[in-house]
Amino acid sequence: MSQPLTVDCPTCGAPVEWSEKNAFRPFCSDRCKLIDLGAWAAEEHKIAGSEESEDELYSGDLEPRH
């Protein structure tokens, strides 16, 4: 039988078995998953892109709501 794939938890670095048995993958625990979610919510993580503001991106695209 082959060895299960192991990855590092993105939050704490602990080894994590990548399998259907691990409901938190790629995280080692619910705690690490929630820490990562909190970091995204606090805008500590960002997806690379241009620095255009939302107003510039969407101005004139939609009719104003009344």
UniProtKB/Swiss-Prot annotation:
Any one Pfam family match given in the protein's UniProt record, by short name: YacG
GO biological process, any: regulation of DNA-templated transcription
Known cofactor(s): Zn(2+)
InterPro entries for the chain: DNA_gyrase_inhibitor_YacG (IPR005584), Znf_NHR/GATA (IPR013088)
Keyword field: Metal-binding, Zinc
Residue positions binding Zn(2+): C9, C12, C28, C32
Residue numbers spanned by region Disordered: 45-66
GO molecular function: DNA topoisomerase type II (double strand cut, ATP-hydrolyzing) inhibitor activity; zinc ion binding
HAMAP family to which the protein is assigned, alphabetical: DNA_gyrase_inhibitor_YacG (MF_00649)
Role description: Inhibits all the catalytic activities of DNA gyrase by preventing its interaction with DNA. Acts by binding directly to the C-terminal domain of GyrB, which probably disrupts DNA binding by the gyrase.
Protein name, entry field: DNA gyrase inhibitor YacG
Gene assigned in the entry: yacG
